[in-house]
Structures are given as structure tokens and as C-alpha cells.
Amino acid sequence: NNAGVMLLGPIVGAPVEEWERMIDINVRGLLHCAHAALPHLLEAAEQGPRNVADLVNISSVAGRTANSGSGVYNLTKHGIGAFSESLRQEITRRHVRVGLIEPGAVATELAGHNRPEIREMIGQRFGDMQRMESVDIADAILYMVTRPGHVAVNEILIRPTEQER
């Protein structure tokens, strides 16, 4: 369950439309996808050959921290973590495992949606650090969902080796 935008900048004087866009995509989008998938996952866990099903939500390392200039983004990612844990507790006895992947810097277009001055700030912060690739996140998801049915890996925090926070 992965959809998101990262529109960074100070809270004071921020375009509220950017906040609404992040909340709509990062939170509401994830909620609606989970809601649509859950009946199918519950059925698969009950009737499928593995007797377990997996819902994996993608958050961010930003769901564990808070930084100046990313307050609303942090809010959306913290919310994904809280939702995932609540849902996990709600459906765990029905053999649907809920996992949360929290990636650090990944080489995607995510930062490119920001205003030019913010893109420059992101570039300075991460410099020439080698970012992860999408396949690194896919490997983490694969690990999570291929555990035996009696094992639930509920969270994976994954960062580039050089990423400080």
C-alpha cells in the first residue's frame, strides 16, 4: 500500500493546498486502499493455502522523527504508523499480518515535486550520499511477506548506510 507525496517547507506561511494534497494522498489514499483490500485479504487468510495474508503499508523514516521544514509530511507518516499498528491489533487473530516499511532516502522522483528552493535544500542535505533503489525496498517487502505463517515481521526501518537520520 504505497502512494505518497513529500512537499516540504516551513509551516509558517506554507501553502495550505500542499498540506491538503499530502493528507489526501498519504493518509486518505492509504486508508481507502486498505479498506478496499481488507475483505479480500481476510478471505485469502481464511480460505487460501497459506492461511495467512499480508497488508504492507509504506511509510517513511519520517514517521519516526520530526524535523523542521517537514512537519506536515511527518504528521502523515506518523499517522500511517499509528493506523498500521491499530489495524494490526484489530485483525491479527484473523491471520492477516500488517507490516510497515519505513524507508529512508530512495532514488525516486519524490523530492522533485517540491519548490526549487526546497529541492536545493534536499540536495544539500543528502549531497552525494548513495540512496537506496526501489529494489531495496522490494527486497524488504519480500522478506516481510515470505515469513512462515506463525511469524509476523511488523516493521522494517531501512536506510542507506550513510543516512544519519
Which residues does each predicted region cover?
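Active-site loop immediately N-terminal to the catalytic Tyr-X3-Lys motif
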Residues: V12, T65-G71
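Active-site helix of classical SDR
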Residues: A34, T76
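A short helix-coil junction within the Rossmann-fold of NAD(P)-dependent oxidoreductases
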Residues: G9, A36-V52
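Residue(s) in the substrate-gating loop at a strand-loop-helix junction
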Residues: S60
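Alpha-helical segment proximal to the catalytic Tyr-Lys
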Residues: P39, Q89-T92
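C-terminal helical subdomain
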Residues: L100-I101, T108, E120-R165
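Substrate-binding pocket helix/loop in short-chain dehydrogenase/reductase
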Residues: P10-I11, E18-I23
